């Protein structure tokens, strides 16, 4: 497993505004989209490509194209949906699947409640979208789910991570072909397993609280 924290002034600026509790949901959504596009630029550096011959208005030349099948983007519901637009703007030809996983706030167990993915993921490059890597439980279970379907190349794009969650992932996935791309590794988890300083509940800040 590899971890990359994207060090860029635009990333730091947008993340600072996201952290601010006074940032309204519409602005939060827009900044999340913009930040994910910046992270995705780094996350896709190793995307699989092949040479392709094209003809410009002047002459024939050899360029670069994605290999087939194209990358598969998998947002983890519901907060991961807020990251999807930023990713597909950069990679519009990617296919999109969905994985519904949630943490029980009392037991901290991970519950899988929905999935829409190909049965066979062999040979697919997969990009998982999940804004907060807190305990690491959700992402760990998502990666295991994808590996069971045949995946062997998974990149996870997150806004923030806690050191505790990263350590747990490293323990269980140290030899796996997994890359974690982040805007920041924060200080710690609090007693409720929230990232500190963090930015609060990403899903609630993206979409509000329904119910």
UniProtKB/Swiss-Prot annotation:
UniProt EC number: 2.4.2.9
Q: Where does 5-phospho-alpha-D-ribose 1-diphosphate bind?
A: 78, 103, 130-138, 201
Which reaction(s) are listed as its catalytic activity? UMP + diphosphate = 5-phospho-alpha-D-ribose 1-diphosphate + uracil
Q: Which keywords has UniProt assigned to this entry?
A: Allosteric enzyme, Glycosyltransferase, GTP-binding, Magnesium, Nucleotide-binding, Transferase
Co-factor binding details: Binds 1 Mg(2+) ion per subunit. The magnesium is bound as Mg-PRPP.
Source domain of life is Bacteria
Gene3D superfamilies (UniProt xref): 3.40.50.2020
GO biological process terms held by the UniProt record: UMP salvage; uracil salvage
Molecular function via GO: GTP binding; magnesium ion binding; uracil phosphoribosyltransferase activity
Pathway of action = Pyrimidine metabolism; UMP biosynthesis via salvage pathway; UMP from uracil: step 1/1
Q: How is it regulated at the activity level?
A: Allosterically activated by GTP.
Sites binding uracil sit at 195, 200-202
Needed cofactors, names only, are:
Mg(2+)
One Pfam family name is UPRTase
Q: Which family does it belong to?
A: Belongs to the UPRTase family.
Query: What does the UniProt record say this protein does?
Result: Catalyzes the conversion of uracil and 5-phospho-alpha-D-ribose 1-diphosphate (PRPP) to UMP and diphosphate.
The protein's matches in HAMAP family, at most eight in alphabetical order, are given as: Upp_B (MF_01218_B)
Protein name in the entry: Uracil phosphoribosyltransferase
Please give the organism. Paenarthrobacter aurescens (strain TC1)
